Amino acid sequence: VYPSGYYNAKARKLKALCKFLHDFCEDDIDRMASRPTQELRIELLRVYGIGNETADDILLYALGHPIFVVDTYTRRLMHRIGVVEERVNYPKLQALFMDNLPSDAQYFNEFHALIVRHSVVACKKSPE
């Protein structure tokens, strides 16, 4: 674990996640992945240090569940093109994607990657 400012907090959060993996699924990721998405999401959100985005990152990228990840890039792009208000909440923005895109993990993964790529290249924090 490389320090990125708050290494003690990061270590505590990683320990909490490891404890969850051990207690919840006996360290069996496949067993964890077989749980229903929303049930697993609720359990992940109970873990110290895991919020909406991190829970959804784990569900989509690590476990292959069809759930859309909302991050700063997603918020920025959707606001700039006039789809949402600047301060839109996570569930509302996530529902926009979940309700209008095919419910497919690979599709969500690729769609989000394209948002990130576009935001890094053309939709920067401070427009030029």
Give the role of each language-model region.
Residues V1-E128:
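Catalytic cores of DNA base-excision repair glycosylases
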